Regions:
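Non-catalytic C-terminal accessory region of glycerolipid acyltransferases
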Residues: 155-307
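A short, well-structured juxtamembrane/interface segment
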Residues: 63-83
Length: 307
């Protein structure tokens, strides 16, 4: 089996880094500098822009993810999904932390998402900014996350893999309210056009409990919303039940409901009428699964606000 180029480059950089550093520093410092040099090829590699990404099956399916999950998550399917079929999953709400997306990525649910759609047959889109964070980017790449650019999304679907998108994006994230149900979708039609261009069925997904995990703060919210629009970087401020551990969520359960797949007819250049038609079907199905399950997983009088 061929050794990936990035590993060869990392080994070369490590040896060169240590050799050069030894001329100026003691061995421990030289090793540290060598390790930093060895990491550079991985950090600079454009792996996130490839549909293949850096998916590592062993890492992505570790039982540790579910064992350490602080809240239980259950997946519910209106229709059984076929492992060999390609889907575009549009998951909502984003929430302040997109917790349910992390659960999908790691399989920390019952059943595990990778038992439904295997990890090597799907990719998840992640904001470009996260791939600029050292080490964290590698963790995401190993879990099957790639850059949320249009070209990458096209290449993933063209390869036959399924795709998971948080369509609401930063806007939906910044609109998150504790125990409220907002989705930012009326103007979001690009994912529908993308699915039609590849003839891929769209699956609406709603995660009850996502907006119950943390209490978002409205502190400087207008400024943070402006910053998010200007620089495409969200700055969520939220807390859990304890002030000394703000990263611990409230003890709630997440119930992630998958609606009926919405079929599309492949067309390289779909008309706006066709995009609107499929978009309308998507909104209707998302509303249907919300209304059907809200009494069991939220409250009977809960309402879904589509913005």
């Amino acid at each position: 089996m061929a050794i990936p180029t990035v590993y060869v480059a990392s080994l070369s950089a490590f040896v060169a880094g240590v050799a050069i550093s030894l001329q100026y520093y003691a061995l421990p410092y030289a090793v540290v500098l060598g390790l930093l040099a060895a990491y550079l090829p991985s950090f600079l590699a454009p792996t996130q822009f490839s549909q293949r990404g850096g998916y590592w099956p062993w890492f992505a399916t570790l039982s540790l993810w579910k064992a350490r999950a602080p809240v239980p998550t259950t997946l519910h399917f209106e229709t059984p999904l076929a492992k060999e079929t390609q889907y575009l999953f549009s998951s909502h709400p984003h929430g302040p932390t997109s917790w349910h997306h992390g659960v999908m990525i790691t399989g920390a649910s019952t059943p595990a998402f990778h038992d439904v759609i295997p990890g090597d047959r799907r990719r998840h889109l992640g904001a470009s900014i996260v791939f600029r964070i050292p080490i964290y980017r590698e963790l995401l790449l190993w879990l099957g996350v790639v850059d949320a650019s249009r070209s990458v999304a096209h290449s993933v679907l063209a390869s036959g893999k399924s795709l998971v998108i948080l369509v609401g994006g930063i806007q939906e994230q910044m609109l998150a309210e504790y125990q409220k149900h907002h989705v930012f979708l009326h103007s979001r039609k690009g994912f529908v056009k993308l699915a039609i261009q590849h003839g891929t069925a769209i699956v609406p997904v709603y995660a009850f409990g996502e907006n119950d995990l943390f209490r978002p703060s409205t502190f400087l919210l207008p400024l943070r919303q402006w910053f998010a629009r200007k620089f495409l970087i969200a700055i969520p401020l939220c807390v859990g039940p304890t002030w000394w551990n703000p990263f611990k969520p409230f003890p709630v359960e997440i119930h992630q409901v998958y609606g009926h797949p919405i079929p599309t007819t492949k067309c390289d250049n779909p008309s706006s009428d066709e995009v609107d038609r499929v978009h309308g079907l998507f909104l209707t199905e998302l509303q249907r699964i919300f209304d059907k399950h809200k009494a069991a997983y939220a409250t009977p009088d809960a309402t879904l606000e589509i913005l």
